Amino acid sequence: MKIKTIIILMLSLLIYNHNLKSQTNKNFIKVDRVMLRIPDSMTYSSQNIANYINIKFHSQNDKARAIYCWITESIQYDFDNMYAIDMYNSDISSDETLKSRKGICTNYANLYSDIANKVGVKTYVITGYTRKKKHVNQNPHAWCVSMIDTSWYMIDPTWGSGYIQNSNYIKKINNNFFKIQPNSFIKSHIPFDPLWQFLNYPITKQEFHHGTSKSKNENLYFNFIDTLKIYESQSSFNRLLSSSIRIESNGICCYLDYDNLSDIKFNIKVHYKKVDKELFNSAANQYKKGIFMLNEYIGYANKYYVPYKSDSEIRQMLEDIRITFNLALQQLEKSKYLTSSLENEIHQLKKSINQALVELKKQKNSLDKYLEIAKKYRETLSNSNEK
């Protein structure tokens, strides 16, 4: 009796899934039919395509499907350049892809993301690599993740447009790479940054290479939702820093991981160099300003403090100079990454600032002596100025 009940339940589930899939396919057909009627003149600009989608469709699901349909149908895979993948080029123009009507994974993903975000479907381009069955692909890959309604789904418009067989590209639309759940997608795609697995228990790179799609460490909970919120509030540089930490903790398992992390660290160093140069230039400007103020003060002191200023006003002149030099030193102390040439420049500038501070101290001591000696005389000047 129990076996019979189980069989009935299984059959019911299969029928339900079949009906659900059939209904989904019918919805796809309806959306696809409308999307493929877009005037050709509108298909050479991502904004024009987005405008058409916004007019014809209202739900996020239909909009996402419309984009997937048009890209997989209209963009050819650039087989000749399949190995010319630049994961770190953020200047890939969607309109250039639309003009040529061909591209590799980065072009597909960037085009999808560009249009999706323009129609109000939050989308990110994700980079990583893939596997088919037990074979890990030795080329990096790019795909998308979209927030459709209230859930995150994985979308791979490149794989959805066709496949390679016997060194030939076969154009064949595949709906299996549209709106995939994260726990299913991880079986074939792993992002460099574990954040983009969208799993509370992300698998490691090593587990992926071993054919695992479920983490063995269920004690290590990862709150990807909160981490994503932090990511979205970060500057591009802080995103690099936090991403590099997550990537290292997830493991480096092949040259693709190493190459990706090396590139991130290189960009971090480039940023530090740029910031250090800006800090140095700012410090140099503060130093020049301080020297100008110091020379102005010395000229004033050499004229026996004429025209008259009160004791507190004169002391404030020296204090302002001290603050300016110290600001320059503070800028230099913020330096993170030093090249040998910049390190030498910073050393020389620090030396010059400290020498200027020594001179400033001498001027302060001279002022203290002068104010003490000329106290009665300055009181007379003060009284005459008040009259």
Residue ranges and their predicted role:
Residues 1-24:
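Bacterial Sec-dependent N-terminal signal peptides
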Residues 39-46, 56-64, 91-94, 98-109, ...:
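Solvent-exposed, acidic/flexible segments
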Residues 85-89, 162, 346:
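Residue-level signal for alpha-helical context at structural boundaries
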